Structure formats: structure tokens, C-alpha cells
């Protein structure tokens, strides 16, 4: 397949801009001396190019997408339509608040809804993704300790069953990361936690249910231990889909958390975004929240102002506003009855699929799971040299997206499966049969498993090479070649370059 830069011809285009003479503008920034090298293609070529690209990818609209810890549920298209209403799209973030009262009402209403769902009292919608929310929440914890003159609290405790971005976010916020192990049941080791807390503990980061799909039965004791040591408790909302509307992080003893609107609340997040990672917190942390705080006045109008001790903006304006609109539509559609039903169905689907696969694949933990479960291919790797990667690649030839591989790290040769609530029983049965068929193939012809996939547009990629020596932009021969590592990298390797 050609890159879009390799298509078209000089002078070809798809714009219909009428002739005009733009006014001269005096700018105070450097201007380009040469025109951008952009593809010159017709609208037909452009449409076909991106249609071809779409055919080579797999999304939730194409088929089963059980990517563990990612909650790849169906994204209702009516939410997209609502977010594209002119009242939402034809506005500017610098407009006066009196001109955008409807938008402020949406922001205020979803903040209120998220607080009700989580058991928190205040919320900011500024963070644009989950890890961004983690970082923001950790800055709130840091600001609170510093406001009390308690600067010695420099350590964040992170269990080995926590979400993968937690240690990185804590380090980014300039905390020392203290890892503690799980017990034999896959939950937090209470004795290890007691030994880890002290007068230098700033807080604990925890995902519940955790990344092996288990709800920690000692959650109230865990948060009590941290609070007794003077620390705060951070809830990673990555797995909130399993418990939304049923139990609330605030009631478990957590002080601050983030939510993933692009996961739990069904906004699109394939292809890298856009996402949204709001942070909700208890009252005592509200003065530190970033961005504008929206208040409803007695006359029904809304105002926006900065919190008294705000940590500063973590993103410009109201972040990914149209993503928030989509999530708000989802919440309104499900309501107080539908939200817990969705969570219960997600748990039911995961347990149904786990039960069907148990006895064929080895489960990492022999417990009732929540919204996802983890299988281990360690035995297959040892006996037949068939890895989790081999199984995942073979699944691609059957039209389903592979599960998350090699995560969580505490499970060797892991495959983490999250079917979500939007899949039917028929789809789950079909997926189970595919998993069983692939396992049978691996037992009959283990050596062939290293060659999968056969039917995808691209076979096995050099994933190690891509990670260590990524080529993330296209450089054509028409542009000035750049020397990288002693080689001319302009236009190298054709299709290996990033398209468009």
C-alpha cells in the first residue's frame, strides 16, 4: 500500500476555497520560508486511502476486542452525534461565560454525576488521559502535605498488582516509589503494607479490582493502615467499569482518584485518543484542583473561577470537551439503574468466558473474577515453546483482537482478557471456540505457531526493533535529508514509515 505522500500529482487537491485576497497580517513569530510538503491528492484518492487504512486495522466496530485493562466496549454513535451539535462545536474557549452557559452546565452536571458515582465531593475535567489523571492526583497529594508543612512525606506505595502506569506517574510527580508484593491470593499483602508505611509515606496508589481482575476483600483495612500512618489513598479508576454504581471508591476510604471516560464511560479511544481522565477527590483536596471551578448560582447561571490553592493548569482550557459531552450522554442514557447493570454484566461476561476456558487454559488465580481475568501460558511455553505472544498472534487470523499480553507482570506468559458488557453471549461463545481452536493448533503443530499471523495485511513485525529504533515521521526525498546514525533517512523503507 502506498503512503499518501506517494500518491497524487502536483496541483491536484480537494479544496473548494473561493478566490479571495486575505488582508496583510503583521505577525511576531517566525514565518516559514518554504511551503509545507503536503500530499496533493483528490478527494476520491483521500477517501479511498483512509478507507484502505481502516480495512487494515481492527476496532470495536469490526469485532471482538478483549484487550484487558482497556475496556474496549462499544461506543454508541448517538453520543458522537450529540457531541457534534453546533452549540458544542461552534464555540471558543475564550468566550465570555455568559455566552457558553449550556456548555458550562454540561461540565457542571457531569462533575456532579462523577462525584455521585465515585463517592467524592469535587472534580476536575482537565486531565486528558488516565496517566495524566494519576499525575494530577499525585500533585494534589503533594500539595496537601506541603500545605501542612509536612515535607518529609516523599514515598508512594504501589502494589505489584497496581495498574502499570502508577509507578511512572509517582516518579514523574517526584515521589520515591515503594513496591509491595501481592499475597498468594493475588491481593495486597497486609503485612508488607504495614511494614512499608511510616512517617515518610505520602500515599498509596491502588487499583481495585486489581490488574489480575480481583476485588481486594481487605480494601477497608488497606486504606485504614495508610491513613493511620498519615498518608492519603489514591484510587486508579482503570477498572471502575466492574463496580460503577455498585460500590464507590470514596466509600472504600480513598481520598482522590481518576476516571477514564474513554474506558468506563464509552468514549472512543482507539488509535491513541482523544481520551479524558477526570480527577475526583474529597472536600479537603478541592482547593488544590487545577483548572476552572464551575459554580451554579442561585439564579441558575454558571460561573467559572480558579480554586484558591490550585496546582495550576495541567492542560489548556477545558481539555477534551467533546469527549466529556460523549461521556455525559452515556451517563444520561444508562442512568442510576443502567450503570450498575452495565457493571454487573461486565462481571458476568468475564466469569462466563473464564469458566468456559478453564480446564483448557490455566488461570492465574482460581477465583471468581470481576470484569477481567488472566491466563498464564507458562506451561505451554515450558513444554512446547509456545508463548503468550504466539497465541495472541494466531488469534489475529480469526478476526478478533488479541488480549493484553505479558501484563500484569506478576503473571508469567500472561494473557489478560476483558470482554466488557457490550458483547453478546453468542459473541463470547464464538470467541471461546476460537481460543480453544488456537490452543488445539498449538498442541498439534507447536513449531508453526511462531509464524502466525498469516491472514493480516502485515505479518509479524520486528517489535523489538520498532521499540528501540522507532521511525515516527515520514521524510520524503523532496525534503532536506536528515542524517541519522550516519545514514540518509529520507524516504527509507517505503511502507515502514508512518502513513499520512
Where are these regions (language model features)?
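General small-molecule cofactor/ligand-binding pocket signal
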Residues: 124, 178-180, 403
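Proline- and acidic/polar-enriched loop/turn elements at helix boundaries
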Residues: 66, 127, 182, 208, ...
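A generic short alpha-helical patch detector that favors 3-5-residue windows
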Residues: 196, 319-322, 365
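A short, small-residue-rich loop immediately preceding and capping a beta-strand
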Residues: 121-127, 155-158
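Conserved phosphate/anionic-ligand binding catalytic regions in large, soluble enzymes, centered on
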Residues: 58-78, 126-134, 265-280, 284-285, ...
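Short glycine-centered, acidic/aromatic-flanked micro-motifs in structured strand/loop junctions
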Residues: 127, 182, 206-209, 375-377, ...
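Conserved PLP-enzyme active-site core in the AAT-like
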Residues: 101-105, 132-299, 309, 385-386, ...
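Non-catalytic terminal extensions of PLP-dependent enzymes
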Residues: 1-122, 146, 247, 297-303, ...
Amino acid at each position: 500500500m502506498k503512503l499518501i505522500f506517494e500518491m497524487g500529482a502536483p496541483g491536484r487537491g480537494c479544496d473548494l476555497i473561493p478566490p479571495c485576497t486575505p488582508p496583510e497580517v503583521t505577525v511576531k513569530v517566525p514565518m516559514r520560508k518554504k511551503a509545507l510538503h503536503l500530499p496533493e491528492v483528490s478527494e476520491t484518492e483521500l477517501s479511498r486511502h483512509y478507507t484502505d487504512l481502516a480495512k487494515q486495522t481492527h476496532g470495536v466496530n469490526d469485532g471482538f476486542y478483549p484487550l484487558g485493562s482497556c475496556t474496549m466496549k462499544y461506543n454508541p454513535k448517538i453520543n458522537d452525534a450529540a457531541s457534534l451539535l453546533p452549540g458544542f462545536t461552534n464555540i471558543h474557549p475564550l468566550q465570555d461565560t455568559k455566552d457558553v452557559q449550556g456548555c458550562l452546565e454540561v461540565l457542571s452536571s457531569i462533575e456532579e454525576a462523577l462525584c455521585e458515582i465515585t463517592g467524592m465531593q469535587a472534580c476536575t475535567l482537565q486531565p486528558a488521559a488516565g496517566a495524566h489523571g494519576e499525575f494530577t492526583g499525585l500533585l494534589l497529594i503533594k500539595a496537601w502535605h506541603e500545605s501542612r508543612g509536612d515535607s518529609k512525606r516523599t514515598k508512594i506505595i504501589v502494589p505489584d498488582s497496581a495498574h502499570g502506569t502508577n509507578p511512572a506517574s509517582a516518579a514523574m510527580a517526584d515521589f520515591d516509589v515503594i513496591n509491595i508484593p501481592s499475597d498468594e491470593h493475588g491481593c495486597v499483602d497486609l503485612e508488607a503494607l504495614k511494614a512499608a508505611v511510616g512517617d515518610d509515606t505520602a500515599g498509596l496508589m491502588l487499583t481495585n479490582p486489581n490488574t489480575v481482575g480481583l476485588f481486594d476483600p481487605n480494601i477497608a483495612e488497606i486504606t485504614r493502615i495508610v491513613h493511620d500512618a498519615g498518608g492519603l489513598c489514591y484510587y486508579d479508576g482503570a477498572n471502575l467499569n466492574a463496580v460503577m454504581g455498585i460500590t464507590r471508591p470514596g466509600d472504600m476510604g480513598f481520598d482522590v482518584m481518576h476516571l477514564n471516560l474513554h474506558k468506563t464511560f464509552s468514549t472512543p479511544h482507539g488509535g491513541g485518543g482523544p481520551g479524558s481522565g477526570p480527577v475526583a477527590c474529597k472536600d479537603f483536596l478541592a482547593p488544590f484542583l487545577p483548572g476552572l471551578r464551575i459554580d451554579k448560582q442561585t439564579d441558575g447561571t454558571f460561573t467559572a473561577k480558579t480554586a484558591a490553592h490550585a496546582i495550576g493548569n495541567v492542560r489548556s482550557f477545558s481539555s477534551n470537551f467533546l469527549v466529556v459531552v460523549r461521556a455525559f450522554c452515556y451517563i444520561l442514557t444508562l442512568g442510576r439503574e443502567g450503570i450498575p447493570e452495565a457493571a454487573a454484566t461486565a462481571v458476568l461476561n468475564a466469569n462466563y468466558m473464564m469458566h468456559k476456558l478453564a480446564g483448557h487454559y490455566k488461570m492465574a488465580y482460581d477465583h471468581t473474577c470481576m470484569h477481567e481475568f488472566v491466563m498464564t501460558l507458562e506451561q505451554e511455553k515450558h513444554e512446547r515453546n509456545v508463548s503468550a505472544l504466539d497465541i495472541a498472534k494466531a488469534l489475529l487470523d480469526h478476526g478478533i483482537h488479541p488480549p493484553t499480553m505479558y501484563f500484569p507482570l506478576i503473571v508469567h506468559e500472561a494473557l489478560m482478557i476483558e470482554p466488557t458488557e457490550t458483547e453478546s453471549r453468542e459473541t463470547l461463545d464464538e470467541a471461546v471456540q476460537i481460543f480453544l481452536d488456537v490452543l488445539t493448533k498449538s498442541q498439534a503443530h507447536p513449531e508453526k505457531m511462531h509464524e502466525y499471523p498469516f491472514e493480516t495485511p502485515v505479518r509479524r513485525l520486528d517489535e523489538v526493533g520498532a521499540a528501540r529504533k522507532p521511525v515516527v515521521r515520514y521524510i520524503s526525498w523532496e525534503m532536506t535529508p536528515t542524517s541519522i546514525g550516519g545514514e540518509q533517512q529520507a524516504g527509507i523503507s517505503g511502507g515502514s514509515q508512518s502513513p499520512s
